[in-house]
UniProtKB/Swiss-Prot annotation:
Cellular component terms (Gene Ontology): Cajal body; chromatin; cytoplasm; cytosol; Golgi stack; nucleolus; nucleoplasm; nucleus
Family: Belongs to the protein kinase superfamily. CK1 Ser/Thr protein kinase family. VRK subfamily.
Organism: Homo sapiens
Function: Serine/threonine kinase involved in the regulation of key cellular processes including the cell cycle, nuclear condensation, transcription regulation, and DNA damage response. Controls chromatin organization and remodeling by mediating phosphorylation of histone H3 on 'Thr-4' and histone H2AX (H2aXT4ph). It also phosphorylates KAT5 in response to DNA damage, promoting KAT5 association with chromatin and histone acetyltransferase activity. Is involved in the regulation of cell cycle progression of neural progenitors, and is required for proper cortical neuronal migration.
Listed result of changing T305A: Does not abolish autophosphorylation
Name by which UniProt lists this protein: Serine/threonine-protein kinase VRK1
Reactions this protein catalyses: L-seryl-[protein] + ATP = O-phospho-L-seryl-[protein] + ADP + H(+); L-threonyl-[protein] + ATP = O-phospho-L-threonyl-[protein] + ADP + H(+)
Record key words, sorted: ATP-binding, Cell cycle, Cell division, Cytoplasm, Disease variant, Host-virus interaction, Isopeptide bond, Kinase, Mitosis, Neurodegeneration, Neuropathy, Nucleotide-binding, Nucleus, Phosphoprotein, Serine/threonine-protein kinase, Transferase, Ubl conjugation
Protein backbone atom coordinates (compact mmCIF):
# COMPACT_ATOMS: atom_id res chain seq x y z
CA UNK A 1 0.00 0.00 0.00
CA UNK A 2 1.41 3.44 -0.87
CA UNK A 3 2.64 5.72 1.83
CA UNK A 4 0.14 8.32 3.03
CA UNK A 5 1.27 11.57 4.56
CA UNK A 6 -1.89 12.51 6.42
CA UNK A 7 -1.21 16.21 6.75
CA UNK A 8 -0.09 16.47 3.14
CA UNK A 9 -2.77 14.47 1.37
CA UNK A 10 -5.04 17.43 0.82
CA UNK A 11 -2.24 19.86 0.11
CA UNK A 12 -0.75 17.73 -2.66
CA UNK A 13 -3.92 17.80 -4.70
CA UNK A 14 -4.24 21.56 -4.41
CA UNK A 15 -0.57 22.45 -4.80
CA UNK A 16 -0.74 21.91 -8.57
CA UNK A 17 2.75 20.53 -8.80
CA UNK A 18 4.19 20.49 -12.28
CA UNK A 19 5.26 17.42 -14.17
CA UNK A 20 8.84 17.23 -15.40
CA UNK A 21 9.18 17.31 -19.18
CA UNK A 22 11.36 14.77 -20.94
CA UNK A 23 15.09 15.44 -21.11
CA UNK A 24 16.84 14.55 -24.35
CA UNK A 25 19.27 11.63 -24.42
CA UNK A 26 22.76 13.11 -24.36
CA UNK A 27 21.74 16.31 -22.59
CA UNK A 28 24.52 17.69 -20.37
CA UNK A 29 23.76 18.86 -16.83
CA UNK A 30 26.22 20.48 -14.41
CA UNK A 31 26.04 19.93 -10.66
CA UNK A 32 26.92 22.38 -7.89
CA UNK A 33 30.52 21.14 -7.85
CA UNK A 34 30.80 22.04 -11.57
CA UNK A 35 30.96 18.36 -12.52
CA UNK A 36 29.24 17.57 -15.81
CA UNK A 37 26.93 14.60 -16.25
CA UNK A 38 25.36 13.17 -19.38
CA UNK A 39 21.72 12.06 -19.39
CA UNK A 40 20.83 8.66 -20.85
CA UNK A 41 17.58 6.83 -21.49
CA UNK A 42 14.64 7.28 -19.11
CA UNK A 43 14.10 4.26 -16.84
CA UNK A 44 11.40 5.51 -14.50
CA UNK A 45 8.76 8.08 -13.80
CA UNK A 46 7.35 9.12 -10.44
CA UNK A 47 4.40 11.32 -9.60
CA UNK A 48 6.06 14.55 -10.70
CA UNK A 49 9.55 13.65 -11.89
CA UNK A 50 11.59 11.38 -14.13
CA UNK A 51 14.56 9.08 -13.64
CA UNK A 52 17.25 8.63 -16.29
CA UNK A 53 20.42 6.66 -16.68
CA UNK A 54 23.41 8.95 -16.15
CA UNK A 55 27.19 8.94 -16.36
CA UNK A 56 30.05 11.40 -16.19
CA UNK A 57 30.24 13.54 -19.31
CA UNK A 58 32.45 12.29 -22.14
CA UNK A 59 32.37 11.89 -25.90
CA UNK A 60 30.70 8.52 -25.40
CA UNK A 61 26.96 8.02 -25.10
CA UNK A 62 25.47 6.80 -21.82
CA UNK A 63 25.42 3.02 -22.01
CA UNK A 64 22.98 0.53 -20.56
CA UNK A 65 25.65 -0.27 -17.96
CA UNK A 66 25.68 3.31 -16.62
CA UNK A 67 26.59 3.33 -12.91
CA UNK A 68 24.25 6.15 -11.91
CA UNK A 69 20.82 7.60 -12.41
CA UNK A 70 19.62 11.18 -12.29
CA UNK A 71 16.32 12.03 -10.65
CA UNK A 72 14.71 15.20 -12.06
CA UNK A 73 11.79 17.29 -10.80
CA UNK A 74 10.59 20.85 -11.44
CA UNK A 75 12.40 23.06 -8.93
CA UNK A 76 9.15 24.34 -7.42
CA UNK A 77 8.18 20.82 -6.30
CA UNK A 78 9.03 19.69 -2.79
CA UNK A 79 9.82 15.95 -2.49
CA UNK A 80 13.23 15.94 -4.16
CA UNK A 81 14.34 19.02 -2.22
CA UNK A 82 13.52 17.24 1.06
CA UNK A 83 15.31 14.08 -0.04
CA UNK A 84 18.36 16.08 -1.10
CA UNK A 85 18.77 17.45 2.41
CA UNK A 86 19.11 13.95 3.79
CA UNK A 87 21.61 12.83 1.16
CA UNK A 88 23.74 15.96 1.48
CA UNK A 89 23.92 15.60 5.26
CA UNK A 90 24.24 11.85 5.58
CA UNK A 91 25.04 10.04 2.31
CA UNK A 92 28.25 11.47 0.90
CA UNK A 93 30.49 8.61 -0.33
CA UNK A 94 33.28 9.47 2.09
CA UNK A 95 30.85 9.39 5.06
CA UNK A 96 29.56 5.98 4.10
CA UNK A 97 33.02 4.56 3.43
CA UNK A 98 34.30 5.81 6.80
CA UNK A 99 31.38 4.14 8.58
CA UNK A 100 32.01 0.87 6.72
CA UNK A 101 35.68 0.92 7.72
CA UNK A 102 35.15 1.81 11.38
CA UNK A 103 32.31 -0.71 11.81
CA UNK A 104 34.11 -3.37 9.76
CA UNK A 105 31.11 -3.93 7.51
CA UNK A 106 31.21 -5.54 4.08
CA UNK A 107 28.89 -2.83 2.78
CA UNK A 108 26.20 -0.42 3.97
CA UNK A 109 22.83 -0.29 2.25
CA UNK A 110 22.54 3.50 2.04
CA UNK A 111 22.63 4.92 -1.52
CA UNK A 112 25.54 7.26 -2.22
CA UNK A 113 24.97 10.89 -3.15
CA UNK A 114 27.09 11.91 -6.17
CA UNK A 115 25.87 15.42 -6.89
CA UNK A 116 22.92 17.72 -7.44
CA UNK A 117 22.02 21.06 -8.93
CA UNK A 118 19.57 23.10 -10.98
CA UNK A 119 19.19 22.84 -14.75
CA UNK A 120 17.31 25.25 -17.01
CA UNK A 121 15.39 23.84 -19.95
CA UNK A 122 13.01 25.76 -22.21
CA UNK A 123 12.74 28.57 -19.70
CA UNK A 124 11.92 26.24 -16.80
CA UNK A 125 14.11 25.31 -13.83
CA UNK A 126 14.62 21.69 -12.77
CA UNK A 127 16.23 20.25 -9.67
CA UNK A 128 18.25 17.08 -10.15
CA UNK A 129 20.16 14.58 -8.03
CA UNK A 130 22.74 12.00 -9.15
CA UNK A 131 22.46 8.68 -7.33
CA UNK A 132 23.60 5.07 -7.45
CA UNK A 133 21.63 2.79 -9.73
CA UNK A 134 19.86 -0.28 -8.31
CA UNK A 135 18.07 -3.42 -9.40
CA UNK A 136 14.72 -4.94 -8.48
CA UNK A 137 12.83 -4.00 -5.34
CA UNK A 138 12.05 -6.65 -2.74
CA UNK A 139 8.30 -6.23 -3.16
CA UNK A 140 8.46 -7.65 -6.71
CA UNK A 141 10.54 -10.59 -5.55
CA UNK A 142 8.33 -11.11 -2.48
CA UNK A 143 5.25 -11.30 -4.71
CA UNK A 144 7.05 -13.58 -7.17
CA UNK A 145 7.85 -15.82 -4.19
CA UNK A 146 4.15 -16.26 -3.39
CA UNK A 147 4.48 -13.55 -0.71
CA UNK A 148 6.88 -15.50 1.47
CA UNK A 149 10.55 -15.29 2.36
CA UNK A 150 12.38 -18.03 4.24
CA UNK A 151 13.28 -17.50 7.88
CA UNK A 152 16.96 -17.26 7.02
CA UNK A 153 16.28 -14.67 4.31
CA UNK A 154 14.19 -12.54 6.65
CA UNK A 155 16.84 -12.61 9.36
CA UNK A 156 19.64 -11.81 6.89
CA UNK A 157 17.64 -8.92 5.45
CA UNK A 158 16.83 -7.58 8.89
CA UNK A 159 20.45 -7.67 10.03
CA UNK A 160 21.42 -5.49 7.06
CA UNK A 161 18.46 -3.17 7.66
CA UNK A 162 19.55 -2.75 11.29
CA UNK A 163 22.97 -1.70 9.97
CA UNK A 164 21.26 0.90 7.77
CA UNK A 165 19.00 2.19 10.53
CA UNK A 166 21.85 2.54 12.99
CA UNK A 167 23.75 4.62 10.44
CA UNK A 168 20.94 7.01 9.54
CA UNK A 169 19.88 7.31 13.20
CA UNK A 170 23.44 8.26 14.15
CA UNK A 171 23.23 10.96 11.47
CA UNK A 172 20.12 12.49 13.10
CA UNK A 173 17.52 11.01 10.72
CA UNK A 174 14.80 8.39 10.85
CA UNK A 175 13.27 6.82 7.76
CA UNK A 176 9.70 6.14 8.84
CA UNK A 177 8.72 3.96 5.86
CA UNK A 178 10.68 0.72 5.84
CA UNK A 179 8.97 -1.77 3.52
CA UNK A 180 9.81 -4.18 0.71
CA UNK A 181 9.13 -1.69 -2.09
CA UNK A 182 11.68 0.69 -0.55
CA UNK A 183 14.37 -2.00 -0.37
CA UNK A 184 16.32 -2.45 -3.60
CA UNK A 185 18.95 -4.97 -4.59
CA UNK A 186 22.38 -4.13 -5.90
CA UNK A 187 21.99 -4.71 -9.64
CA UNK A 188 24.96 -7.08 -9.90
CA UNK A 189 25.01 -8.46 -6.36
CA UNK A 190 21.58 -9.72 -5.25
CA UNK A 191 22.92 -10.36 -1.75
CA UNK A 192 23.18 -6.62 -1.09
CA UNK A 193 20.06 -4.65 -0.19
CA UNK A 194 19.64 -0.87 0.00
CA UNK A 195 17.01 1.28 1.71
CA UNK A 196 15.74 4.09 -0.53
CA UNK A 197 13.08 6.84 -0.56
CA UNK A 198 14.16 9.52 1.88
CA UNK A 199 11.68 12.08 0.57
CA UNK A 200 9.87 12.05 3.90
CA UNK A 201 12.83 11.17 6.14
CA UNK A 202 12.63 13.09 9.39
CA UNK A 203 15.46 14.84 11.23
CA UNK A 204 14.47 13.71 14.70
CA UNK A 205 17.51 15.05 16.52
CA UNK A 206 18.78 18.30 14.92
CA UNK A 207 22.06 19.45 16.48
CA UNK A 208 21.79 16.58 18.98
CA UNK A 209 18.48 17.71 20.53
CA UNK A 210 15.73 15.08 20.28
CA UNK A 211 12.26 16.27 19.30
CA UNK A 212 9.78 16.03 22.16
CA UNK A 213 6.92 13.55 22.26
CA UNK A 214 3.87 15.45 21.08
CA UNK A 215 0.66 14.09 19.59
CA UNK A 216 -0.66 16.06 16.62
CA UNK A 217 -4.14 15.04 15.39
CA UNK A 218 -3.33 16.44 11.94
CA UNK A 219 -0.50 13.94 11.54
CA UNK A 220 -2.32 10.81 12.72
CA UNK A 221 -1.62 7.63 10.72
CA UNK A 222 1.29 9.02 8.66
CA UNK A 223 3.15 6.39 6.66
CA UNK A 224 2.23 3.10 5.03
CA UNK A 225 -0.74 2.09 7.14
CA UNK A 226 -0.01 -1.63 7.62
CA UNK A 227 3.56 -1.03 8.79
CA UNK A 228 3.56 2.43 10.37
CA UNK A 229 4.40 2.75 14.05
CA UNK A 230 1.96 3.29 16.90
CA UNK A 231 3.59 6.69 17.47
CA UNK A 232 2.76 7.66 13.88
CA UNK A 233 -0.82 6.44 14.31
CA UNK A 234 -1.06 8.86 17.24
CA UNK A 235 0.33 11.79 15.26
CA UNK A 236 3.75 11.76 16.92
CA UNK A 237 6.84 12.61 14.87
CA UNK A 238 8.93 9.59 13.78
CA UNK A 239 11.64 8.30 16.08
CA UNK A 240 14.22 5.53 16.29
CA UNK A 241 11.89 3.17 18.13
CA UNK A 242 9.30 3.72 15.40
CA UNK A 243 11.70 2.58 12.67
CA UNK A 244 12.48 -0.56 14.66
CA UNK A 245 8.80 -1.27 15.26
CA UNK A 246 8.13 -0.96 11.53
CA UNK A 247 10.92 -3.44 10.80
CA UNK A 248 9.28 -5.88 13.20
CA UNK A 249 6.01 -5.73 11.25
CA UNK A 250 7.94 -6.22 8.00
CA UNK A 251 9.63 -9.34 9.35
CA UNK A 252 6.29 -10.86 10.33
CA UNK A 253 4.72 -10.10 6.96
CA UNK A 254 7.70 -11.46 5.02
CA UNK A 255 7.53 -14.71 6.99
CA UNK A 256 3.77 -15.23 6.94
CA UNK A 257 2.47 -13.22 3.99
CA UNK A 258 -0.04 -11.36 6.14
CA UNK A 259 -0.41 -9.06 9.15
CA UNK A 260 -3.45 -9.48 11.44
CA UNK A 261 -4.87 -6.02 10.60
CA UNK A 262 -4.36 -6.14 6.82
CA UNK A 263 -7.98 -7.05 6.11
CA UNK A 264 -9.17 -3.68 7.38
CA UNK A 265 -6.59 -1.12 6.23
CA UNK A 266 -9.29 1.39 5.31
CA UNK A 267 -9.93 1.88 9.04
CA UNK A 268 -6.70 3.37 10.44
CA UNK A 269 -8.09 3.48 13.99
CA UNK A 270 -8.75 -0.25 13.83
CA UNK A 271 -5.19 -0.81 12.60
CA UNK A 272 -3.78 1.35 15.40
CA UNK A 273 -5.86 -0.33 18.10
CA UNK A 274 -4.87 -3.77 16.81
CA UNK A 275 -1.19 -2.86 17.01
CA UNK A 276 -1.62 -1.48 20.53
CA UNK A 277 -3.45 -4.61 21.64
CA UNK A 278 -0.79 -6.91 20.22
CA UNK A 279 2.04 -4.78 21.62
CA UNK A 280 0.60 -5.34 25.09
CA UNK A 281 0.61 -9.09 24.46
CA UNK A 282 3.35 -10.09 22.04
CA UNK A 283 2.62 -13.77 22.69
CA UNK A 284 -0.88 -13.35 21.26
CA UNK A 285 0.60 -11.68 18.17
CA UNK A 286 2.89 -14.66 17.68
CA UNK A 287 0.03 -17.12 18.15
CA UNK A 288 -2.06 -15.23 15.60
CA UNK A 289 0.68 -14.96 12.99
CA UNK A 290 2.38 -18.32 13.59
CA UNK A 291 -0.31 -20.85 14.57
CA UNK A 292 2.05 -23.77 13.97
CA UNK A 293 4.41 -24.96 16.69
CA UNK A 294 7.54 -23.78 14.87
CA UNK A 295 7.38 -20.16 16.02
CA UNK A 296 10.42 -17.92 15.42
CA UNK A 297 11.28 -17.02 19.00
CA UNK A 298 13.74 -14.35 17.88
CA UNK A 299 10.89 -12.31 16.36
CA UNK A 300 9.00 -12.32 19.66
CA UNK A 301 12.15 -11.35 21.57
CA UNK A 302 12.88 -8.57 19.08
CA UNK A 303 9.36 -7.15 19.43
CA UNK A 304 9.49 -7.40 23.23
CA UNK A 305 12.80 -5.50 23.25
CA UNK A 306 11.60 -2.74 20.93
CA UNK A 307 8.36 -2.15 22.83
CA UNK A 308 10.34 -1.27 25.98
CA UNK A 309 12.13 1.65 24.29
CA UNK A 310 11.22 5.16 25.35
CA UNK A 311 10.49 7.73 22.64
CA UNK A 312 13.87 9.45 22.96
CA UNK A 313 15.89 6.38 23.95
CA UNK A 314 18.86 5.28 21.87
CA UNK A 315 18.40 1.62 20.89
CA UNK A 316 21.09 -0.96 21.57
CA UNK A 317 21.47 -2.05 17.96
CA UNK A 318 24.06 -4.68 18.77
CA UNK A 319 21.63 -6.37 21.18
CA UNK A 320 18.97 -6.44 18.47
CA UNK A 321 21.44 -7.93 16.00
CA UNK A 322 22.39 -10.56 18.58
CA UNK A 323 18.72 -11.54 18.90
CA UNK A 324 18.47 -12.10 15.15
CA UNK A 325 21.79 -13.94 15.07
CA UNK A 326 20.42 -16.31 17.72
CA UNK A 327 17.50 -16.92 15.37
CA UNK A 328 19.90 -17.92 12.60
CA UNK A 329 21.71 -20.23 15.01
CA UNK A 330 18.41 -21.83 16.02
CA UNK A 331 17.81 -22.95 12.43
CA UNK A 332 21.38 -24.18 12.00
CA UNK A 333 22.52 -21.20 9.98
CA UNK A 334 24.75 -18.16 10.40
CA UNK A 335 25.21 -14.64 9.06
CA UNK A 336 26.88 -15.60 5.78
CA UNK A 337 25.66 -12.54 3.87
CA UNK A 338 23.51 -14.64 1.50
CA UNK A 339 19.90 -13.53 1.10
CA UNK A 340 18.72 -16.75 -0.61
CA UNK A 341 15.58 -15.20 -2.11
CA UNK A 342 13.68 -18.44 -2.71
CA UNK A 343 10.10 -19.66 -2.55
CA UNK A 344 8.82 -21.23 0.69
CA UNK A 345 6.37 -24.08 1.16
CA UNK A 346 2.71 -23.58 2.04
CA UNK A 347 3.20 -20.48 4.15
CA UNK A 348 5.66 -22.22 6.44
CA UNK A 349 9.20 -21.25 7.35
CA UNK A 350 10.97 -23.92 5.29
CA UNK A 351 12.62 -22.84 2.05
CA UNK A 352 12.52 -24.82 -1.16
CA UNK A 353 14.46 -24.51 -4.38
CA UNK A 354 13.26 -21.79 -6.72
CA UNK A 355 11.87 -23.01 -10.06
CA UNK A 356 13.53 -22.09 -13.35
CA UNK A 357 10.38 -20.27 -14.45
CA UNK A 358 10.24 -18.22 -11.25
CA UNK A 359 13.96 -17.47 -11.45
CA UNK A 360 13.49 -16.18 -15.00
CA UNK A 361 10.62 -13.94 -13.86
CA UNK A 362 12.77 -12.46 -11.09
CA UNK A 363 15.72 -11.91 -13.44
CA UNK A 364 13.44 -10.18 -15.95
CA UNK A 365 12.08 -7.94 -13.21
CA UNK A 366 15.61 -6.62 -12.70
CA UNK A 367 15.84 -5.26 -16.24
CA UNK A 368 15.62 -1.46 -16.18
CA UNK A 369 12.38 -0.33 -17.78
CA UNK A 370 10.33 2.81 -18.03
CA UNK A 371 7.87 1.34 -15.54
CA UNK A 372 10.51 1.19 -12.80
CA UNK A 373 10.18 4.04 -10.34
CA UNK A 374 13.33 3.62 -8.28
CA UNK A 375 17.07 3.42 -8.82
CA UNK A 376 19.40 0.57 -9.62
CA UNK A 377 23.04 0.05 -8.70
CA UNK A 378 25.23 -1.62 -11.33
CA UNK A 379 28.66 -0.32 -10.52
CA UNK A 380 30.51 0.72 -7.43
CA UNK A 381 32.22 3.90 -6.38
CA UNK A 382 35.47 2.42 -7.68
CA UNK A 383 33.95 1.97 -11.13
CA UNK A 384 32.97 5.62 -11.30
CA UNK A 385 36.44 6.69 -10.20
CA UNK A 386 38.03 4.36 -12.77
CA UNK A 387 35.95 5.91 -15.55
CA UNK A 388 36.97 9.35 -14.37
CA UNK A 389 40.68 8.49 -14.40
CA UNK A 390 40.41 6.87 -17.83
CA UNK A 391 38.70 9.89 -19.33
CA UNK A 392 41.26 12.26 -17.86
CA UNK A 393 44.04 10.25 -19.54
CA UNK A 394 42.19 10.37 -22.86
CA UNK A 395 41.72 14.12 -22.57
CA UNK A 396 45.45 14.59 -21.96
Amino acid sequence: MPRVKAAQAGRQSSAKRHLAEQFAVGEIITDMAKKEWKVGLPIGQGGFGCIYLADMNSSESVGSDAPCVVKVEPSDNGPLFTELKFYQRAAKPEQIQKWIRTRKLKYLGVPKYWGSGLHDKNGKSYRFMIMDRFGSDLQKIYEANAKRFSRKTVLQLSLRILDILEYIHEHEYVHGDIKASNLLLNYKNPDQVYLVDYGLAYRYCPEGVHKEYKEDPKRCHDGTIEFTSIDAHNGVAPSRRGDLEILGYCMIQWLTGHLPWEDNLKDPKYVRDSKIRYRENIASLMDKCFPEKNKPGEIAKYMETVKLLDYTEKPLYENLRDILLQGLKAIGSKDDGKLDLSVVENGGLKAKTITKKRKKEIEESKEPGVEDTEWSNTQTEEAIQTRSRTRKRVQK
